């Protein structure tokens, strides 16, 4: 777990130095390394659960790690594909400071208005602005904010992600998704009893959890 923690710690450092910015009706917003730092803390808690033989809790937190990472990838892809000024519109501006400022102002005004934004962009902004939880936004949650929805969006809108899923992750995703759901919903008494296993099974449970985490 420590080695995996270091990977996410490095990712957090990288994402804090690679900030993605966009604009909405409530002003500018950005995506940085917040999710990666949160995942690092969750991994520390998973490590503690394993130390205390609380594997049912560890798998529940492992599900949280998976969901948080998928949500981050969803939000990142939406921001990277924001619908502001088109390439054709940008080409009409000349390369001088005054023209560049006008181009930036037009791009920001289009983003703030939201007139070209997709439903995914508008829903993502509600998440950024911390208003997604409100009852009037329940359809956005239903349509976009679920791990299966994140996966569907990413596979449909990012060719690299689609290639990775189709060629390397299909079987593992189905297998591990089923396992994590079983622990979260306690689909059998053994998923509850894994919170107090016998010591002679600890090594096997550690190995199994690491394989799922990887």
Question: Where does each model-flagged region fall?
Answer:
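N-terminal, Lys/Arg-enriched amphipathic/low-complexity engagement segments
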Residues: 1-35
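A short secondary-structure junction motif
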Residues: 15, 72, 183, 187-191
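Short non-catalytic regulatory patches outside canonical folded cores
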Residues: 20-30, 47, 51-52, 60-178, ...
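Active-site-adjacent bridging/hinge elements
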Residues: 35-43, 197-199
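C-terminal/domain-terminus segments
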Residues: 159, 163, 188-211
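Amphipathic, Lys/Arg-enriched alpha-helical patches that create a basic surface
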Residues: 170-179, 201-214
């Amino acid at each position: 777990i420590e080695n995996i923690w270091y990977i996410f710690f490095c990712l957090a450092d990288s994402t804090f130095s690679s900030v993605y910015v966009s604009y909405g009706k409530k002003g500018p917003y950005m995506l940085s390394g917040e999710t990666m730092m949160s995942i690092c803390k969750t991994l520390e808690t998973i490590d503690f659960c394993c130390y205390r033989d609380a594997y049912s809790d560890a798998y529940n937190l492992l599900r949280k790690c998976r969901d948080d990472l998928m949500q981050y990838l969803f939000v990142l892809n939406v921001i990277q594909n924001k619908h502001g000024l088109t390439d054709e519109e940008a080409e009409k501006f000349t390369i001088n400071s005054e023209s560049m400022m006008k181009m930036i102002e037009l791009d920001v005004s289009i983003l703030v208005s939201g007139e070209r934004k997709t439903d995914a962009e508008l829903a993502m902004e509600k998440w950024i602005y911390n208003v997604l939880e409100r009852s009037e936004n329940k359809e956005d949650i239903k349509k976009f904010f679920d791990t299966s929805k994140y996966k569907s969006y990413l596979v449909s809108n990012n060719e690299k992600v689609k290639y990775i899923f189709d060629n390397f992750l299909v079987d593992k995703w189905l297998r591990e998704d089923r396992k994590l759901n079983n622990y979260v919903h306690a689909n059998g008494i053994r998923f509850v009893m894994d919170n107090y296993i016998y010591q002679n099974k600890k090594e096997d449970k550690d190995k199994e959890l690491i394989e799922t985490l990887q």
